[in-house]
Amino acid sequence: MARYVFITGGVVSSLGKGIAAAALAALLQARGYRVRIRKLDPYLNVDPGTMSPYQHGEVFVTDDGAETDLDLGHYERFTGRPANQQDNITTGRIYRNIIEKERRGDYLGATVQVIPHVTDEIKNFVLEGNEDYDFVLCEIGGTVGDIEAMPFLEAIRQLGNELPRGTAVYIHLTLMPYIPAAGELKTKPTQHSVKELRSIGIAPDILLVRADREIPESERRKLSLFCNVRESAVIQALDVATIYDVPIAYHKEGLDSEVLSAFGIDPAPKPRMDRWEEVSNRLHNPEGEVTIAIVGKYTGLKDAYKSLIEALYHGGLANKVKVNLDWIEAEVFESEDPAPYLEKVHGILVPGGFGERGAEGKILAAKFARERKVPYFGICFGMQMACIEAARNLVGIENASSTEFGPTKEPVVGLMTEWLKGNMLEKRASAGDLGGTMRLGAYEAALKSGSKIAEIYGSTDISERHRHRYEVNIDYKERLESAGLNFAGMSPDGVLPETVEYPDHPWFIGVQYHPELKSRPFEPHPLFASFIEAAIEQSRLV
């Protein structure tokens, strides 16, 4: 039977519940347990697919095409277990499910209410499909006290009573702020947060306390006394240099042992931490460094590129180098020469994005990389802009563009439905729904034998995750290839371009998919490992 760990947050948001859940899962895995992590998001959106990156950060896409919270990326990277649609639920999805059931008459005329109908739907989500796991970790989004989170907290309170005794543990993540004027850490915010949680009917078993410095024993005893938690269960969560240091830090503080003890499980033997220690050692003792320019449009919020950042660091791990990131807003290149920004970097990465803003800047970044022989990695939108750049400057199609930006006579990039569906042209209404209208999830691709990208993968058959509405128009394939841009990867039916590259360039690759979503610290994605390797070579030239 699965045991359940419910992780809540208090005082402020963005304390790192997702990292805490992922780190605990990694520690339990290191002891040989089978672990699943689920995220319960209180917002009313059905999923984050149509939310602004500035509001929500990255949308993490799973193999089965779910658009989910970025925390699921942490779960995958720390545990190696692919997430799926059933690992993330939102209030919006819950309400939609309930309304559909009500319309079908499933409730037999009953008045539909938050309790029991909404809470039952949440509980069903938490309990479903856990037969093959020893532990199920459930992260509750938001902060205790938020009105949106109340149904979720009520649901996990009920589960504490309904599950067999000894199979549910509650962890509360809080903040102990340091007040410089007083020269001390303050326990009062945590006390009030726990008081709020207890008023709901949830008594935390473990306090995980974020702080920027060591918490004195006297303050731990104080928290233990006023929050009614064992002193050994007041665990400090100090700031660390990288997220990959967190499992080691939490193990040293005894989090995994305390969780097992709370379940009545002997915490011996110790977990095997070898691979985490190796990752930490490589991060803290690099043998060199490279600088990668990220030419994007959401650079004001780094969480919009969370998986991308981590995948670049993984590429650094594979090559034992530190990866420095130079963030450049693409729009800058529309009014300024890219050269001063790009001539000293060792690689240029143009990530995915939506809309016309910054597109011309990304095209100029691709042009600079092509002409100056600087390693270039174009992902999704970055591949599309590289193809438009080639069409304009190598093929001579001056007005080459994308239908994403408006009507154009030369749609080098467009909705695939605009040129092909069977053999019929299809139009999508510009005012139609955006949600659920993209190519999402894992799709196979066939790579050309002998191409650079096939050599990097070590295979001609791959499967990668997608998230896009627009594709490079296959009608331009022949002209672009004649100009030197090789379409090295296509969908198995030969209809949709998946990868492009310049054979005469040291490293210039564009991919329509998102390889960053499948990179892990212990298994860096081969494209990122190769890109950083090319950047190391470039660093010897500049």
Swiss-Prot record:
CTP binds at residues 13, 146-148, 186-191, 222. Allosterically activated by GTP, when glutamine is the substrate; GTP has no effect on the reaction when ammonia is the substrate. The allosteric effector GTP functions by stabilizing the protein conformation that binds the tetrahedral intermediate(s) formed during glutamine hydrolysis. Inhibited by the product CTP, via allosteric rather than competitive inhibition. Gene3D superfamilies: 3.40.50.880, P-loop containing nucleotide triphosphate hydrolases. UTP binds at residues 13, 186-191, 222. The active site is at residues 380, 514, 516. Residues 1-265 are annotated as: Amidoligase domain. Mg(2+) binds at residues 71, 139. GO terms for cellular component: cytosol. Pfam families: CTP_synth_N (PF06418), GATase (PF00117). L-glutamine binds at residues 54, 353, 381-384, 404, 469. ATP binds at residues 14-19, 71. GO terms for molecular function: ATP binding; CTP synthase activity; glutaminase activity; identical protein binding; metal ion binding. Keywords: ATP-binding, Glutamine amidotransferase, Ligase, Magnesium, Metal-binding, Nucleotide-binding, Pyrimidine biosynthesis. GO terms for biological process: 'de novo' CTP biosynthetic process; pyrimidine nucleobase biosynthetic process. It catalyses: UTP + L-glutamine + ATP + H2O = CTP + L-glutamate + ADP + phosphate + 2 H(+); L-glutamine + H2O = L-glutamate + NH4(+); UTP + NH4(+) + ATP = CTP + ADP + phosphate + 2 H(+). SUPFAM superfamilies: Class I glutamine amidotransferase-like (SSF52317), P-loop containing nucleoside triphosphate hydrolases (SSF52540). Pathway: Pyrimidine metabolism; CTP biosynthesis via de novo pathway; CTP from UDP: step 2/2. It comes from the Bacteria. Catalyzes the ATP-dependent amination of UTP to CTP with either L-glutamine or ammonia as the source of nitrogen. Regulates intracellular CTP levels through interactions with the four ribonucleotide triphosphates. Belongs to the CTP synthase family. CTPSs have evolved a hybrid strategy for distinguishing between UTP and CTP. The overlapping regions of the product feedback inhibitory and substrate sites recognize a common feature in both compounds, the triphosphate moiety. To differentiate isosteric substrate and product pyrimidine rings, an additional pocket far from the expected kinase/ligase catalytic site, specifically recognizes the cytosine and ribose portions of the product inhibitor. Homotetramer. This is CTP synthase.
